[in-house]
């Protein structure tokens, strides 16, 4: 909307400037005199439009203030999404670190420190019984020696008849008792170890399940971060479009693309963060520049408010004086017609001089030196030329018929010179024919 109004202001200003020559031509050349009133009306309408447009621009809810408010809102939003984006990128960096740490743990598992270790004491009392057995029996005579076991697998009749057999039975009995005791304790301790191993396996499964859960949560969090970064990227791009920022490199990937590429190219995410900080800084500087420009424009159009009022007043007063002069001369001609008396050119010249004085006073009191001043000066120059021509005229004799009615009489010079009185065809006129004045 702001651009449309500024374009309209420029077009109206150009139109006003373009009316200077047609206005002067309508005042000085008979071929264009019939356009004078239309040109004057167009000048008035253009001045009124420019004044209204200026008021619209500086109004409380006008486009300038609206644009300033919009830029301030964009600046505030950019600051918020900048902080949010940098936070998300730092989180993304943390996730990247966690992924790297997880990969390193798979390939190299560091040992635990002493403080991290939890000692588990395992009792092994069956070995005491086992050692007693080994002390009684030579290792060579145990099952560890497979050859000896094969040799002793059978007992001969001679062994039974041997006097030492009973002694050996008692020895076997003792050995058997020791082994039963060791076996009982051993099986109990195995059950304890199996229970401990079962707990270890349960812990192992729990740890694996927790790792899966954590990795799943990390993946979900990473996906959420990526989605938020994408939304931020879209919001930033929308703001850039709305403020007319063209500094965005179209070749540059979006944040989401950059994050996705982290897993491929493995760039330093710190570099990406620095790029975002720089980009936001450029955006904020651009907004500040626009805000400064709009603020200067607002102050400029505020100062123009009184200027446009002065221009409109000057032009309106000029037209009012011209109209008053035309009415005065028309009334004089009408009065002369009514009484059938003669009218002296000096009377008309006196009125022209009187109104020229008023018009010149308007120009002298005005500080304007622009288009409107030139337009009023055209009117003044036209009256001056008319006055000079009237000074060169012979005496005029009233020759108006009583049967003729006065209907918008106008001044016209029927001579070699074009009309230069500044009076339009809708206003007072006189006809020079030696010494006679006739109503058209």
UniProtKB/Swiss-Prot annotation:
Keyword check for Disulfide bond:
no
Membrane topology per the record?
A: Peripheral membrane protein
Q: Name one GO cellular component term.
A: membrane
Subcellular location(s) of the protein: Cytoplasm; Membrane
Record bears the keyword Ligase: no
Q: Which residues form a coiled coil?
A: 32-108, 183-234, 274-311
For this UniProt record, the keywords arranged alphabetically read as follows:
Autophagy, Coiled coil, Cytoplasm, Membrane, Protein transport, Transport
List, in alphabetical order, the GO biological process terms annotated in this UniProt record.
Answer: autophagy; protein transport
Q: Which domain of life is it from?
A: Eukaryota
Q: Which family does it belong to?
A: Belongs to the ATG23 family.
What is the documented function of this protein?
Required for cytoplasm to vacuole transport (Cvt) vesicle formation and efficient autophagy. Plays a role in ATG protein retrieval from the pre-autophagosomal structure (PAS) and is especially required for autophagy-dependent cycling of ATG9. Also plays a role in regulation of filamentous growth.
* Designated name of the protein: Autophagy-related protein 23
- What organism is recorded for this protein? Candida glabrata (strain ATCC 2001 / BCRC 20586 / JCM 3761 / NBRC 0622 / NRRL Y-65 / CBS 138) (Yeast)
């Amino acid at each position: 909307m702001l651009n449309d109004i500024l374009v309209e202001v420029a077009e109206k200003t150009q139109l006003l400037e373009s009316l200077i020559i047609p206005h002067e031509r309508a005042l000085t050349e008979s071929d264009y005199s019939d356009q004078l009133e239309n040109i004057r009306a167009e000048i008035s309408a253009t001045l009124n439009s420019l004044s209204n447009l200026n008021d619209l621009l500086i109004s409380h809810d006008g486009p300038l203030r609206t644009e300033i408010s919009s830029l301030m809102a964009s600046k505030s939003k950019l600051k918020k999404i900048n902080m949010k984006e940098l936070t998300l990128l730092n989180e993304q960096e943390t996730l990247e670190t966690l992924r790297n740490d997880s990969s390193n743990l798979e390939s190299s598992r560091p040992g635990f420190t002493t403080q991290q270790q939890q000692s588990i004491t395992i009792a092994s009392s069956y070995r005491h019984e086992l050692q007693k057995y080994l002390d009684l029996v030579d290792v060579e005579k145990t099952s560890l020696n497979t050859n000896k076991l094969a040799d002793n697998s059978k007992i001969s009749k001679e062994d039974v008849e041997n006097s030492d057999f009973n002694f050996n039975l008692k020895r076997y009995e003792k050995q058997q008792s020791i082994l039963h005791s060791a076996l009982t304790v051993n099986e109990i301790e195995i059950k304890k170890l199996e229970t401990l191993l079962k707990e270890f396996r349960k812990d192992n499964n729990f740890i694996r399940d927790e790792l899966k859960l954590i990795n799943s949560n990390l993946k979900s969090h990473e996906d959420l971060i990526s989605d938020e970064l994408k939304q931020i990227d879209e919001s930033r791009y929308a703001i850039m479009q709305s403020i007319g920022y063209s500094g965005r490199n179209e070749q540059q990937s979006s944040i989401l693309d950059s994050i996705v590429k982290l897993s491929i190219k493995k760039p330093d995410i710190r570099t990406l963060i620095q790029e975002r900080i720089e980009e936001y800084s450029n955006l904020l500087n651009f907004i500040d520049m626009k805000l400064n420009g709009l603020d200067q424009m607002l102050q400029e159009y505020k100062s123009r408010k009184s200027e446009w009022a002065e221009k409109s007043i000057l032009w309106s007063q000029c037209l009012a004086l011209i109209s008053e002069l035309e009415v005065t001369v028309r009334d004089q001609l009408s009065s002369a017609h009514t009484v059938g008396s003669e009218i002296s050119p000096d009377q008309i010249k006196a009125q022209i001089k009187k109104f020229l004085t008023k018009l010149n006073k308007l120009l002298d009191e005005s500080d304007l030196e622009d288009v409107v001043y030139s337009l009023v000066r055209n009117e003044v120059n036209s009256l001056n030329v008319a006055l000079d021509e009237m000074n060169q005229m012979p005496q005029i004799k009233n020759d108006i018929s009583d049967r003729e009615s006065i209907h918008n009489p106008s001044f016209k010079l029927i001579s070699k010179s074009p009309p230069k009185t500044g009076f339009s065809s809708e206003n007072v006129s006189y006809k020079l024919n030696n010494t006679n004045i006739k109503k058209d």
